[in-house]
Regions:
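Transmembrane helix-bundle core of multi-pass membrane transporters
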Residues: 11-12, 87-148
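Membrane-helix/interface signature in polytopic inner-membrane proteins
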Residues: 141-174
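Transmembrane alpha-helical segments in multi-pass inner-membrane proteins
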Residues: 194-243
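C-terminal binding/interaction regions
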Residues: 2-6, 114-122, 222-259
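Short loop segments and helix-boundary regions at transmembrane helix junctions
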Residues: 27-109, 205-217, 234-237, 260-262
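Membrane-interfacial amphipathic/re-entrant helices at transmembrane-helix boundaries
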Residues: 1-22
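Loop-to-transmembrane alpha-helix initiation sites
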Residues: 14-17, 61-68, 85-89, 133, ...
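Small-residue-rich segments of transmembrane alpha-helices in multi-pass membrane proteins
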Residues: 45-57, 91-103, 123-124, 167-179, ...
Length: 262
């Protein structure tokens, strides 16, 4: 594993893009798991992939087109009064069908559809870095504001109703934040890699952490460390980044959870 490739000027921008997303997505995934909406990560990613592909078909970069589909899903979920993972399962099906149909009926071909699923991190440029940085700032600024309300809503579900609190704005705000995070993640590191970062580190953190602060640090730490290892491995072995990241996340966190359980 050649760590020098990480600081190579050719891969510096792609590395920074992925590094930001590797810290952001696990933080969003923590709250999705807390709300029992972990499938949201995959549903929003699929909608983002579909709208990103549609954007490419009309000449719009995927990283700009992807948020439109994810935001549409977040709005539909918020104002459609849907609860649980059912709506996100429908998003997966809709996004998958749209992606395959657009890929099959456009000049882009199925290769671009597969590229969106697997990720095109190595080709990330300034526009991708700017999008990732914006999402990173929104998460750093927004989560401390949204988190207390979201946690209280989960632990004390009757508090909002009994106190006549209009908490829908906080839930909708987080839905939008999660949609943006998954959209930029899907448009840069790939659909399945983005889902893995939002799902696997929080799963492990919930199993081994002592409190919420500990959970936050563990999930973000797992995401960042696994990303750095996967990035170096993928470049050194000339392998696609997305599958390598998923493999590193699953193997490392699975082993850590098993060791901790014993």
């Amino acid at each position: 594993m050649n760590l020098e490739l990480i600081v190579d000027p050719l891969f510096r921008t792609p590395f920074l893009v992925g590094l930001i997303m590797s810290a952001v997505l696990p933080l969003l995934g923590n709250l999705l798991r807390l709300r029992d909406e972990w499938l949201a990560a995959l549903g929003l990613a699929y909608l983002a992939g579909a709208s990103g592909l549609i954007g490419l078909a009309v000449g719009i970069p995927a990283v700009l087109g992807a948020p439109l589909g994810a935001l549409a899903g977040a709005i539909a979920k918020a104002f459609g009064q849907f609860r649980g993972n059912t709506v996100y399962a429908m998003m997966v099906l809709i996004g998958w069908a749209a992606t395959m149909l657009v890929a099959a009926n456009s000049v882009l071909g199925s290769a671009v559809g597969h590229a969106l699923v697997e990720g095109q991190l190595y080709f990330a440029g300034t526009i991708h870095l700017a999008a990732a940085a914006v999402v990173g700032v929104l998460v750093v600024v927004g989560l401390p504001v949204l988190m207390p309300t979201l946690i209280r809503s989960r632990l004390l579900p009757g508090h909002e109703v009994s106190n006549r609190l209009k908490a829908w704005r906080w839930h909708f705000g987080f839905d939008v934040l999660a949609a943006l995070g998954m959209a930029i993640g899907a448009g840069t590191i790939g659909l399945m890699a983005a889902f893995a970062l939002a799902f696997v580190p929080p799963w492990a953190a919930f199993r081994i952490s002592r409190n919420w602060r500990h959970c936050t640090l563990i999930s973000a730490g797992i995401g960042v460390v696994a990303y750095i290892i996967a990035f170096a491995l993928a470049l050194s072995l000339d392998q696609p980044f997305g599958p390598v990241l998923v493999a590193v996340l699953v193997v490392s966190t699975g082993a850590a959870v098993m060791i901790r359980s014993y």
